[in-house]
Amino acid sequence: MTEYKKVIAQNKKALFNYFIEERLEAGIVLKGSEVRSLRQGKASIEESHAADTRHEVFLYNCHIAEYEKANRFNHATRRPRKLLLHTKEIKKIIGRIRIKGYTLVALSMYFNKKNKVKVELGIAKGKKLHDKRESIKEKDWKRDQSRLIRQK
């Protein structure tokens, strides 16, 4: 059974720059003008990451554009946003992040079937330069294989 997801933003760089070891879903605390802006698709999570602060997890560097029809009570575009997770999940994430080399990266932001905004997070380990080159070669080889198969 496939789940309904209306994708707002994706972080394609994260898949290239990190080895994603585990994926999880989290809710996010937003203001009304932020939700309206997200419905228009005006968000970017290219440079965003999550970190723990006093047993809570926050999403940093996520850009949600200002809603142009909002009045003077508009939101700040790059403010830290609290992620909604269960206590067990938070403890598990904090335990994994504290290990050297691991980070929590936002992979995608979407509306679920109940029209709630969700963020897909990945517990990731950074790639070295030679790993990135290897993944580029692998990608090119798969592309060449599909071309060869189509030509036959």
From Swiss-Prot:
Pfam families: SmpB (PF01668)
Keywords, sorted A to Z: Cytoplasm, RNA-binding
Gene Ontology BP term (one): trans-translation
CDD domains for the chain: SmpB (cd09294)
Compartmental location: Cytoplasm
Gene Ontology CC terms: cytosol
Family of the protein in this entry: Belongs to the SmpB family.
NCBIfam families named among the record's database cross-references: PRK05422.1, smpB
Protein's job: Required for rescue of stalled ribosomes mediated by trans-translation. Binds to transfer-messenger RNA (tmRNA), required for stable association of tmRNA with ribosomes. tmRNA and SmpB together mimic tRNA shape, replacing the anticodon stem-loop with SmpB. tmRNA is encoded by the ssrA gene; the 2 termini fold to resemble tRNA(Ala) and it encodes a 'tag peptide', a short internal open reading frame. During trans-translation Ala-aminoacylated tmRNA acts like a tRNA, entering the A-site of stalled ribosomes, displacing the stalled mRNA.
Name by which UniProt lists this protein: SsrA-binding protein
Species name: Rickettsia conorii (strain ATCC VR-613 / Malish 7)
